[in-house]
């Protein structure tokens, strides 16, 4: 009997209390998640396209932030109701994942998630099997990804790079040309960084430097909470070939750096135990220090440390070479004009290494390249050569106010990431047309059952949404635009929302990176499918703790 009651409560979505938790089931659970998804997507979708609107964000400190960046808007949204917030958090995860993978397309990923999940909820409410819907959605996504790869073509010119960057920067041709020039000067594999400028104009500077794929060992070293990175001007650099675990090894160098009022970056095989704890403790007390793992493994790690030492003018500290960490003096440390360290990478700008020594190192690597017969070794040598000899392009963002610089910096970062994605996987027609025309590949698909067919239809309908939203944001009826384009059946024909005309998107320079479109669809479908097949949610019950009463006043 008790089991029957429990089953009935589950079926009808009633509350079920356990210690400190609130549990909701079935349709009620999905409806609450959908509310969060729809509200977040509504705030994000207004930014899509060249005629998309700005969103103003309240910040706990400083001035409000104005942005057209979808992921920035999504990250600022938090709902008081924890049930509704669960859905919003999942979509924020989609936007963040999309931003991490390809740097753009976050708004597209968000509205695709909403479209698939909303229709999935309706289908489940109508009695369809959630797992069959999931199979149909996944099959359709695989088919569309294959279609995107078919129509994709490699990016081939500086002009096309400029076009991709311009579109991602909301039609700003100055930004597009700036990024194209940077890539032309340092190569498509080169390092480009974006920094705040000190003038009204945007500037591009090519400086000597290198980047390697290792970040800070602990998040306690972050000194820029907004950007989640550690950034030092004019630091000294300690390069150690070996592990550091004994705090006594570090005491002399920490005292030396503190007495000289210097910022310290330590690059070593690893820093652990008491040594790491001591660094974090001293960081909390005001010492400007950051610890970074050396890049690579084995012999490659050793030569990478030597490359870093040459760039920065440091001496590699190694007991094998007869130099102990306890005996380090200031002359053995390198330096740089600037170092930027995040969780995944480190960029050393304008190191103090001797120019002749750097050139000698470059020639040594080139000589090794001519002798090697191994493809793996050749790849590693080419990577090292690019890091040492290629330099770093720095885009300095100008503007009349902090708000303007911040908004433009977001757009430049988006444009830069989108351009890198285009170089990696090629381009497709933009303006939502690539996804729109991919619906034609789904029309004649035969599935195992009706529910799976509905799953395919859910994806097919969702693929219309990006193009429709771009048109709606431009003040045009999106349904009319979609009808006209589908009747044309020309994969390069689309609606130019900036000019309000129908034309060939490739010839007009309206193009999207294939990687951006592909990952937006995959991420959106993945999370939307999981939410559609969700049958219960568990949230913490928020307890309202009363304010402590004031003590009674004493009578004197």
UniProtKB/Swiss-Prot annotation:
Induction: By heat shock. It comes from the Eukaryota. This is 60 kDa heat shock protein, mitochondrial. The keyword Transferase does not apply. One of its GO terms (biological process) is defense response to bacterium. It is found in: Mitochondrion matrix. The keyword ATP-binding applies. Belongs to the chaperonin (HSP60) family. GO terms for cellular component: mitochondrial inner membrane; mitochondrial matrix; mitochondrion. It comes from Dictyostelium discoideum. Disulfide bonds: none annotated. GO terms for molecular function: ATP binding; ATP-dependent protein folding chaperone; protein-folding chaperone binding. Implicated in mitochondrial protein import and macromolecular assembly. May facilitate the correct folding of imported proteins. May also prevent misfolding and promote the refolding and proper assembly of unfolded polypeptides generated under stress conditions in the mitochondrial matrix. Keywords: ATP-binding, Chaperone, Mitochondrion, Nucleotide-binding, Transit peptide. Its main location: mitochondrion.
């Amino acid at each position: 009997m008790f089991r029957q009651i429990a089953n009935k409560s589950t079926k009808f979505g009633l509350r079920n209390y356990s210690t400190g938790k609130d549990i909701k089931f079935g349709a009620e659970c999905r409806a609450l998640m959908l509310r969060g998804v729809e509200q977040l997507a509504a705030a994000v979708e207004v930014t899509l396209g060249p005629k998309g609107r700005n969103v103003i964000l309240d910040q706990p400190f400083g001035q409000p932030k104005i942005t057209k960046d979808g992921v920035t808007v999504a990250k600022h949204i938090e709902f008081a109701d924890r049930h509704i917030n669960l859905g919003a958090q999942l979509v924020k995860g989609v936007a963040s994942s999309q931003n991490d993978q390809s740097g753009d397309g976050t708004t597209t990923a968000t509205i695709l998630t909403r479209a698939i999940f909303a229709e999935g909820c309706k289908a489940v409410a109508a009695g369809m099997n959630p797992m069959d819907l999931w199979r149909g959605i996944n099959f359709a996504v695989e088919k569309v990804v294959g279609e995107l790869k078919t129509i994709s073509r490699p990016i081939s010119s500086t002009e096309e790079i400029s076009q991709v960057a311009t579109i991602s920067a909301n039609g700003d041709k100055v930004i597009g040309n700036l990024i194209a020039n940077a890539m032309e000067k340092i190569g498509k594999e080169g390092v480009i960084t974006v920094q705040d400028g000190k003038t009204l104009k945007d500037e591009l500077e090519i400086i000597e430097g290198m980047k390697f794929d290792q970040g800070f060992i602990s998040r306690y070293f972050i000194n820029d909470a907004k950007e989640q990175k550690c950034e030092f001007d004019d630091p000294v650099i300690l390069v150690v070939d070996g592990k550091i675990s004994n705090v006594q090894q570090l005491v002399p160098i920490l005292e030396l750096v503190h007495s000289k009022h210097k910022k310290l970056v330590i690059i070593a095989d690893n820093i652990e135990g008491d040594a790491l704890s001591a660094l974090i403790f001293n960081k909390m007390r005001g010492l400007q220090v950051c610890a970074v793992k050396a890049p690579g493994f084995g012999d490659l790690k050793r030569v990478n440390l030597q490359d870093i030492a040459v760039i920065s003018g440091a001496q590699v500290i190694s007991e094998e070479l007869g130099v102990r960490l306890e005996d380090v003096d200031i002359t053995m440390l390198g330096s740089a004009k600037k170092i930027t360290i995040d969780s995944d990478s480190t960029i050393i700008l304008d190191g103090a290494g001797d120019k002749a020594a750097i050139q000698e190192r470059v020639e040594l690597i080139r000589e090794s390249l001519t002798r090697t017969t191994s493809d793996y070794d050749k790849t590693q040598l080419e990577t090292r050569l690019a890091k040492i000899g290629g330099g770093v392009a720095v885009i300095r963002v100008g503007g009349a106010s902090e708000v303007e610089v911040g908004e433009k910096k977001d757009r430049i970062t988006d444009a830069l990431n989108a351009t890198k994605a285009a170089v990696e996987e090629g381009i497709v027609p933009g303006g939502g047309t690539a996804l729109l025309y991919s619906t034609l590949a789904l029309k004649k698909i035969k599935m195992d059952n009706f529910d799976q067919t509905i799953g395919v239809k859910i994806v097919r309908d969702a693929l219309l949404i990006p193009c429709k939203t771009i048109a709606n944001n431009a003040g045009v009826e999106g349904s009319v635009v979609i009808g006209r384009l589908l009747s044309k059946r020309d994969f390069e024909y689309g609606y130019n929302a900036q000019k309000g005309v129908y034309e060939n998107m490739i010839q007009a320079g309206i193009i999207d990176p294939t990687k951006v479109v592909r990952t937006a669809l995959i991420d959106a479908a993945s999370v939307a499918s999981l939410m559609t097949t969700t049958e219960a949610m568990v949230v913490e019950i928020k307890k309202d703790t009363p304010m402590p009463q004031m003590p009674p006043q004493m009578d004197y």
